[in-house]
């Protein structure tokens, strides 16, 4: 099946196309959505920090206008990326997720981290360049392992103090330098709840642009230990029966997918599809 959305490095000197606008408050939208005629959008009273050509949607070029600040546009409002994730149009969310990552990266790499000189966008390449240092900086992607630990009809779920009240989720953490995905998973589970795991199975991945994570999802079986929550990181962790689960993460998340797949398998139901 052909994807409606493909990323690309587009020449911002070319006219036309569609554009999305991102400010500190999120993305601009109106009754027709988040895509605006590019030339019209650039004529509005917007504090444009930078423009990036980011790809093609249904064959049409799409650009990002990254803004210094939030501006009022008649008939329009601003909405955060997480809200778009929950809205249901997964293709538009993928466009905005990519735009958010490119905008964040470019904003954070306006100046060279080595010498402090201003960096410039490299033509036809997704990179920022410092000429005095001959240094290129590329978009950051942070690999994070996320795992559902299981024990028969039970699943191990935990909650962070940062979670929505009452919601429990799977365990997760970022990979350290020199660490394999499996080593990271084992370490994170041990650190967060002092549980040992075995029979690790890769389940899929999901881009998580908050701001630049790549979530690698796994199932793992309980191998031993008693739950001891990591101080300041895990507020509570429990074994839950698949027939009696607490409030769970949003259905579009890979955390929810990992849980739903295991529950479906235990109950003999059809397995869900991993959201993009």
Swiss-Prot record:
Name of the featured protein: NAD-capped RNA hydrolase NudC
Cofactors required: Mg(2+); Mn(2+); Zn(2+)
Alphabetical keyword list: Hydrolase, Magnesium, Manganese, Metal-binding, NAD, Zinc
UniProt: Zn(2+) binding residues: 112, 115, 130, 133
Encoding gene per record: nudC
Organism: Pseudomonas fluorescens (strain Pf0-1)
GO cellular component entries: cytosol
Binding site for a divalent metal cation 3: 188, 192, 233
Motif (Nudix box): 173-194
